Curated annotation (Swiss-Prot):
Active site feature: C402 (nucleophile)
The protein's name in its UniProt record: Uncharacterized RNA methyltransferase NEQ053
Sequence positions that bind [4Fe-4S] cluster: C87, C93, C96, C162
TM region positions: none
CDD domains given in the database record: AdoMet_MTases (cd02440)
Top EC group: transferase
Coiled coil: none
UniProt keywords, alphabetically: 4Fe-4S, Iron, Iron-sulfur, Metal-binding, Methyltransferase, S-adenosyl-L-methionine, Transferase
Binding site for S-adenosyl-L-methionine: Q284, Y313, E334, D375
One GO molecular-function entry: 4 iron, 4 sulfur cluster binding
InterPro entries documented for this protein: MeTrfase_TrmA_AS, NA-bd_OB-fold, SAM-dependent_MTases_sf, U5_MeTrfase_fam
Enzyme Commission number(s) from the entry: 2.1.1.-
Family: Belongs to the class I-like SAM-binding methyltransferase superfamily. RNA M5U methyltransferase family.
Amino acid sequence: MFTKYKFLYFLFDSTFFKYWYVIPMAMKIYIEGFDEKGYGVGNNIHVPFAYPGDIVEVKVRRKGKKKIGEIVKIIEESPYRTSNKYCAHLGKCGGCLWGLMDYQYQLEFKKKVIENLFGYDKDIIPSPKTIYYRNRMDYPIYNKVSLKEPGKWYGYIPIKECKMLSKEAEIIINEFNKFIEKYKIPSWDTVKHTGFLRYLVIREGKFTKERMIHIITYKRKKFEELWDFIENIKDLVTSVYWGIREDLGDVSISEKLYHYYGSKFLRERILDIEYYISPNSFFQTNSYQAVNLVKIVKEFLEPSENDVVLDLYSGVGLFSLQIANEVKKVIGIEIVEEAVEMAKLNASINNIDAEFIASPVEKAPIIKANKIIVDPPRAGLTNKAIEYIEKINPDTIVYVSCNPYTQKRDINKLKGYKIIDMQPLDMFPNTPHIENVILMKKSRTTD
């Protein structure tokens, strides 16, 4: 039977689809600048892995109203390019979109983004490490461990190395590829919605040298073969989980978890605080730069013994636990119940008095607080979340964001506050993403 899923697969996989969306003639274009995603732009064509000053020959396809270019040949290289090609997959997988650009120029372009958005001339704090800096990678499985092509949710690049995580992770990736081949385990097909293996998630404690493996699959009663893989990597890991996700969405979070090996949690240490992290919990992905992030948040917040602080989108308590001993009270609000449980555990193991509430920010209780830390996801604050903050009416807001575009949008909506200072950081080297911390104070009526 020719179901709608088979039709979609035919559409995506067929020559018809490729030529219907691809302009058949290659075009030569000059790259003038970047778009918000970090793609090079020239002649209104958006080109991954192209940088200002490049002259490139591209094949063009349409994605909605946008024209996307795929580099066929670099005719003249941008002066911003680097000769340090540190990974075999550079220019193919979407993990390091700016990986072919010199790091100092990456910082300069990120600085320009902040300056154009906010009018602040602030140097970006560089990442202490530019490779092997991430503490988590979520690798989709498509026959082999893979990463995705930029802008293509259905396009996979099989990998044998990844310079974002660690050398040990590269060994694990290759062992998992051998494991897949040995047992002929089918991978999940995001179009047909068939198969089994979905994601290999590797998490690391950069300061504790611990490592957690979280293998996410479609539903199945048993996964006995997994013990064979564990036997081959057990000297490299401290924890292994098998997780099941029955939902058809392409998300690397498990609905059911089975603990197979080692510790139940991954530990990470930021400054003097130890954090326990569960498989589905969020944690800042660059532990080295998280140290600087925490210091900036504390500097902007200026915690004192009379302060009551609300930490919105508090996760496992990264900021709350760092300031708890310096304020009268800190309350974290977090929608993910698993993260709230971890935050409570982290408070306990560090002998810290802090309160955590499982709730969407929009539905959280109104708490009298004079200071707020807010660190929302990339999508930023909803209108209801902004209304909640305005009801609290704090004197000080410290807004931490991994997306300065939505941060700018939200600040424009917040009534009665003005920007006092900001500090951008490079949490994500070799990508166009920017972390930005903004200090806001309540405006006086005479201002």
